[in-house]
Amino acid sequence: MAKEGNCPRASILIITLWVLGFLTILVVNLGFMVRTQLQFADHLQDRLKMYYLARAGIERAVAELYKDENKSYDSFNEPWANKEEFFKDFAFGGGFITLKYQTGSLPGQEDITLYGIMDESGKIDINSVPLDILTILLERIGQVETEEAIDIARAIVDWRDIDIAVLPGGAEDEYYQGLSSPYKCKNGKFQIPQELLLVKGMTPEIFSRIKGIITVYGTERVNINTASFDCLYALGLSSSLCERIIKFRQGSDEACGTEDDFIFKSPSDLMSVGSLFTDEAAQINTLISRNMLAVRSDIFRINSQGILRNEKGERSREIICVLKRQEEKAPKILYWHEN
């Protein structure tokens, strides 16, 4: 039989063990919480550092753009457009900055990666492009049958114009209000290219094919020094002529953005691209007479990546900026997006 004096001692021992167990669990949990908070703080610090690296890339690009000495034309072989040693993996502030973009090549070839600033004026502005060119774009690049391309083009014009008159095959409020999830026809300019997906007849498949050659940023004339094969083809030029323009522009090394590139200093210089057939000369003259071609730019896209490389691997943040270059003034920001 146990002595009565041992019971309090046993109780004290049990309580002590319970307290020690509780304190152990508490310490472990506190340690886990502190470690998690430190990791989270470290993560936030890295995100902030990558953000400011990307911001620094934007400023670096703007400075290079404003050093451009060629005021009469803009092309791929200028430093702002393609300068790998300046825009690829530039070490700064404990990280790296990269500015790069892709431009279309000839059919059957992979897109070309360049390090620098993208000329947004080398694209077709869906806010101002005429109906007939819009139809050609949808037919040739969007791979849409002619009749369907005409209807989608008319629906796009109905979406962007300010009136409520419906073009044949187009659409205004009556159509959009009758959808299962109704909305209004905008009757105003497109603000982002993805807005096309709201237009009658436009599908994700068609949009994915045309998105690389369209813009919404007021470039009514296409820069023939930076326009891709697809963009030139969408303007109504023949496939053969588009290929000759690209090769003529690339020079003898057949590379984009190098010293031997040929630069068009006037839209009429297109007439010097080899021997033109009568219909090809007519195609060029038509675009020139409609004031749809240019050789310089004012609107540019900057894709700036802030990159960190350490024991955690490689991580990055990207800022996409579209700006308008202005003489004697700071650039005007037209679009800003942080990934």
Cite the ranges covered by each PLM segment:
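Compositionally biased linear targeting/interaction segments
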Residues: 2, 11-339
